[in-house]
Amino acid sequence: MTRQATIDRTTSETSIRLSIDLDGTGQTDIATGIGFLDHMLTALARHALLDLTIRATSDLHIDDHHTTEDVGIVLGQALRQALGDKKGIRRFGHAIVPMDEALAEAAIDLSGRAHVAWSVPFLQSKVGTMDTELFEEFFRAFGGNALMTLHVTLKAGTNTHHVAEACFKAVARALRMAVERDPRVGDAIPSTKGAL
């Protein structure tokens, strides 16, 4: 069974086409129009071992908000679709990842319930040209549309670039663990309810 999905989403603000392969090798082809977001999404895919293609056009003449949030929405929808009924997955994932002085922790439960807890203070309002408040918007959109429980916590860090990158890599490693097939589970759904 292939665990792939392609989502097209067009609104008056953005037009996004995204393809994901959960059993990839971390290959990416990403163009959102926001350089730093592309960099973070590349890191996410590489460390989660997802193949990820994203094409986004949007109202960047206004700001980066709509693009960042909508890419999160579509990525969450694609992840949910690619997972299907979630038979045989590990379901839970966690990681603590350093990036120089920054240390970020992420925990994921592919529970079918949307909850995002974000505890990541930034000392600067921008990294490059991107507003740092948009990282929370991205992960809330991603986690909410994937119907996952996602906790992201900054344990240490002062450099804005390092903090953001540690968060994306921690989520990537946690996601890699959660979507991985568990040979001990077989084709069972990892829930006492029998459904996720």
From Swiss-Prot:
GO terms for cellular component: cytoplasm. Keywords: Amino-acid biosynthesis, Cytoplasm, Histidine biosynthesis, Lyase. InterPro entries: IGPD_sf, ImidazoleglycerolP_deHydtase, ImidazoleglycerP_deHydtase_CS, Ribosomal_Su5_D2-typ_SF. GO terms for molecular function: imidazoleglycerol-phosphate dehydratase activity. Pfam families: IGPD (PF00475). Pathway: Amino-acid biosynthesis; L-histidine biosynthesis; L-histidine from 5-phospho-alpha-D-ribose 1-diphosphate: step 6/9. It catalyses: D-erythro-1-(imidazol-4-yl)glycerol 3-phosphate = 3-(imidazol-4-yl)-2-oxopropyl phosphate + H2O. Its EC number is 4.2.1.19. It is found in: Cytoplasm. It is an enzyme of class 4 (lyase). GO terms for biological process: L-histidine biosynthetic process. The keyword Cytoplasm applies. NCBIfam families: PRK00951.1-5, PRK00951.2-1, PRK00951.2-4. Belongs to the imidazoleglycerol-phosphate dehydratase family. This is Imidazoleglycerol-phosphate dehydratase. It comes from Granulibacter bethesdensis (strain ATCC BAA-1260 / CGDNIH1). The lineage of its organism: Bacteria, Pseudomonadati, Pseudomonadota, Alphaproteobacteria, Acetobacterales.
